[in-house]
């Protein structure tokens, strides 16, 4: 086997020729899904709450981007922080204190708001700390964390990529590329994707998100 075709060149002697060929025939998820790491507050007790701890009128649930969020004059916004194994949709329990005053504080704390140009955009999210990858649709309006990682594929490919990332095929690639207890954005970037039967996959994924 030519293990050099696998990013990082792991010695995975059990993989097939087809497994290795996908790295040259397919597109890397890093090129079409833009996996990103989000923010770490450095003080979760101060900045985070469960959504049901607050009055609904204090939470902005439909911000399009950072400027839209700040104009809303709301203090709290949906926050994706990973969570338990769950596919397709869910784990939307946290909110973050993210008005202008606290935005400026967070710029100087934790990991200084990396990838903030992507905050509030729809995408796909998964938990960094996990032994098995489970990916969910993340709608517009969410800030995301350093342990609730997020990818940003084009709208026409979002459902297909979500289906692929929740498949046994993708889990097999993750096992080879990232055999540890964490699934970081750099590992996801390396996974190859070959698109086929797109309409059928999109339909199945739509049903899974809905139900």
Model features per residue range: what roles?
Residues 207-211:
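Non-transmembrane amphipathic alpha-helical segments
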Residues 1:
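Conserved P-loop NTPase catalytic core
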Residues 4, 12-13, 17-203:
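Polybasic, glycine- and aromatic-enriched phosphate-binding surface used to engage nucleic acids
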């Amino acid at each position: 086997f030519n293990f050099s075709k696998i990013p990082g060149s792991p010695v995975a002697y059990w993989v097939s020729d087809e497994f290795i060929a996908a790295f040259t025939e397919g597109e890397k998820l890093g090129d079409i899904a833009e996996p990103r790491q989000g923010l770490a507050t450095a003080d979760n007790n101060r900045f985070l709450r469960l959504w049901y701890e607050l009055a609904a009128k204090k939470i902005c649930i439909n911000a399009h981007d950072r400027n839209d969020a700040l104009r809303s004059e709301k203090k709290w916004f949906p926050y994706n922080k990973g969570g338990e194994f769950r596919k397709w949709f869910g784990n939307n329990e946290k909110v973050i204190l993210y008005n202008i005053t606290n935005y400026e504080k967070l710029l100087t704390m934790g990991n200084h708001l990396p990838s903030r140009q992507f905050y509030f955009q729809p995408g796909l999210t998964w938990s960094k700390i996990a032994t098995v990858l489970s990916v969910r649709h993340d709608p517009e309006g969410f800030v995301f964390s350093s342990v609730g990682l997020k990818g940003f594929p084009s709208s026409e490919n979002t459902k297909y990529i979500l289906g692929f990332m929740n498949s046994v095929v993708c889990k097999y690639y993750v096992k080879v590329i990232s055999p540890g207890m964490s699934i970081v954005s750099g590992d996801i970037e390396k996974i190859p994707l070959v698109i086929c039967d797109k309409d059928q996959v999109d339909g199945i994924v739509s049903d899974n998100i809905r139900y």
